[in-house]
Amino acid sequence: HGAGNLGRQAALLAGLPITTSGVTVNRFCSSGLQTIATAANYVRNDGADVVVAGGVESLSFPGGGGSMQNNDPKLAQQYPAIFMPMIDTADIVAERYKISREYQDEFSLESQRRMAAAQQANKFADEIVPMATKMKVVNKETKEESIVDYVVNRDECNRPDTTLEGLAKLAPVRGEGKFITAGNA
């Protein structure tokens, strides 16, 4: 999002001294997880006493991460697959390894159920730091917008009311004959 070295900015905004280093890791969907693995490596192998790790992935504002306009034309010509969107990769893998749409929907449903049960049991309470923010609320009837104070204290992207029937009704993103939908991606 044009944030430059976001890791360094976060360190400074957290009140750490200017002598504190910061590293930004971009791995799209798994950047946060990768930073934790990298931090563990610094502690285990490099003798670091303290390392802070985190991620800023956003499903509501993903940015333009993989758009072709940001890719080197020579690389795109020589190795087009490295710029392939994940949705296309997932469809190819499903077709190649004969992973049916039905199986993917069943797997997704089970994942949703497990997430709902974990949230109900507060399994992530020690791992998610509540974050105060502002949220834009749009009235669906009047379209009136307002900004409200809000605390994010849990993953809000899961759908605990998901059903197999609902998943089956979703059209594949890349069209008929493909596998990946908004519900099983």
Report residues per predicted region:
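Short acidic, glycine/serine/threonine-rich loops at helix termini
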Residues: 3-4, 61-67, 142-143
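Short glycine-/small-residue-rich flexible loop motifs, especially phosphate/cofactor-binding loops
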Residues: 8, 91, 116
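Conserved catalytic cysteine-centered active-site region
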Residues: 1-49, 69, 80-88, 160-185
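N-terminal extracellular/periplasmic Venus flytrap/periplasmic-binding protein-like
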Residues: 106-185
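Glycine/threonine-rich beta-strand-loop-alpha-helix active-site module
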Residues: 46-75
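A glycine/threonine-rich phosphate-anchoring loop and its flanking beta-alpha core
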Residues: 65-102
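Short loop/turn and capping residues at structural boundaries
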Residues: 22, 54, 62, 105, ...
